[in-house]
């Protein structure tokens, strides 16, 4: 349930005599729909959005959202009981053939800065902050590349001398991002070469992991004419070709053109206003001309593409890519998510119970909906000689759902599995930080509870309709050529 704490001055002009207006613990609140919420956010009228668990008056956690600059969002999540805090800066840019170049930026930034010229200096500073840790992540959200730098620490109330640990950790993070160590105006060549090797090793490890490799190859083939087909880390050749001059140019482009999300997840006692002011001070001289990018959704497949490769592994990898009939990320989302889960998202699903358990055709077999692109993947590990049987069985189970051959118990099991998964998001600051980061593309920052309520309203007829929108696009088979155990599968 979305409940917005609003400025009283806008009640009459924006809400009127809405029956949804009520008072809770001295706070005037109103239940609103998503369209009105988005309009109020744009007007800067919403102070806070609170989530109250269904049937309970106790506040679980609060979420504040503000736009503090051009395409710069500031999100704070506060919950009583957190013993640690997590703050992050995420930069979203269009996914292009320069993915390798941008993927290297978080690594080089967290290596040194003007104030902390070596890793040793940085580690000493983090040690004074009770062992705070810096982390980086590169992900793909739709046809966008998201570069994330984060810092995790103990909560302020555990500091021995009442220090503002979270704010000081954010200061270190901003120092790394906005004041990197340059020599003659560029990143140090030795440091760039070192980080290139590490990034190439990371990508190489993904190639060696055949389950990950097969999934990435499916996306590359299925979306060959779409930006989504590009690996979030780029290519080995792309990494090796990077120069320190090119990396410096890309870094400046990132600060200028990326959409930015500053997120802080902590105990309710942490003062986040000071963190916002600190960020604005560091970013004050940064020129901003943000570049917008919309993900292309392909609703259906006209033909099926089939590609087979071989590898020296025992277990074959069969990956099937489906188009979900979505025009955008919100197009019948709840029904399609439940459909994907009934199909292969949990131990009670069709793929698990029938294809894996009853027919014994797969070592593993599951489906996964990729909402940000409107596609669904089925990944399975099989004996290569069972390829045709496995493909047929997987498609047969999808047909069963299209015909409505599943029970209300199957539907309820999927809803319960998704509810449990979404509720676990609020278990830690890190999980909440990741949750809101995934929503950076459209600035539609909704709670896990919002989606749980969406799922509760999905009917069997909704799932049947969603299944009938699904079309098979691409099949990728990685055939094993080895009999021995022990390969990286």
Regions found by a protein language model. Name each.
Residues 241-248:
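Active-site glycine-rich loop that binds ribose-phosphate moieties when present
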């Amino acid at each position: 349930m979305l409940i917005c704490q609003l400025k009283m001055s806008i009640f009459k002009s924006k809400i009127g005599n809405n029956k949804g207006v009520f008072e809770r613990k001295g706070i005037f609140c109103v239940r609103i729909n998503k369209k009105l919420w988005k309009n109020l956010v744009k007007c800067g009228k919403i102070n806070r959005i609170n989530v109250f668990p269904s049937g309970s008056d106790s506040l679980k956690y609060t979420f504040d959202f503000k736009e503090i600059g051009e395409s710069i969002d500031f999100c704070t999540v506060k919950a009583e009981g957190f013993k640690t805090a997590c703050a992050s800066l995420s930069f979203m840019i269009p996914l292009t053939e320069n993915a390798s170049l941008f993927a290297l930026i978080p690594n080089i930034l967290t290596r040194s800065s003007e104030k902390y010229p070596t890793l040793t200096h940085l580690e000493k500073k983090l040690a004074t902050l009770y062992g705070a840790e810096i982390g980086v992540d590169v992900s793909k959200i739709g046809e966008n590349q998201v570069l994330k730098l984060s810092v995790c620490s103990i909560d302020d109330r555990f500091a021995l001398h009442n220090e503002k640990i979270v704010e000081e950790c954010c200061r270190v993070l901003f120092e790394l991002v906005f004041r990197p160590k340059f020599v003659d105006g560029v990143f140090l060549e030795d440091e760039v070469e070192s980080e290139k090797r590490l990034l190439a090793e990371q990508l190489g490890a993904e190639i060696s992991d055949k389950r990950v490799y097969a999934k990435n190859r499916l996306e590359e083939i299925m979306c060959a004419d779409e930006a989504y087909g590009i690996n979030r880390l780029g290519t080995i050749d792309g990494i090796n070709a990077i120069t320190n001059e090119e990396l410096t140019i890309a870094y400046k482009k990132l600060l200028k053109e990326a959409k930015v999300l500053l997120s802080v997840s902590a105990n309710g006692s942490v003062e986040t206003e000071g963190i916002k002011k600190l960020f604005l001070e560091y970013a004050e001289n940064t020129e901003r001309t943000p570049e917008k990018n919309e993900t292309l959704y392909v609703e259906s497949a006209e033909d099926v593409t089939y590609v087979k490769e071989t590898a020296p592994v025992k277990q074959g990898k069969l990956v099937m890519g489906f188009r979900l009939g979505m025009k955008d990320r919100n197009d019948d989302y709840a029904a399609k998510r439940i459909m994907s889960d009934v199909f292969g998202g949990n131990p009670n699903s069709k793929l698990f119970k029938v294809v894996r358990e009853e027919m014994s055709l797969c070592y593993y077999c599951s489906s996964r909906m990729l909402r940000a692109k409107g596609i669904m993947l089925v990944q399975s590990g099989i004996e290569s000689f069972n390829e045709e049987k496995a493909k047929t069985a997987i498609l047969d189970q999808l047909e069963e759902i299209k015909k409505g051959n599943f029970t209300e118990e199957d539907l309820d099991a999927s809803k319960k599995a998704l509810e449990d998964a979404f509720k676990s998001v609020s278990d830690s600051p890190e999980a909440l930080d990741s949750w809101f980061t995934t929503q950076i593309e459209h600035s539609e920052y909704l709670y896990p509870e919002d989606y749980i309520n969406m799922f509760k309203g999905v009917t069997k007829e909704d799932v049947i309709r969603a299944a009938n929108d699904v079309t098979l696009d691409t099949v990728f088979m990685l055939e094993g050529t080895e009999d021995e155990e022990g390969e990286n599968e």
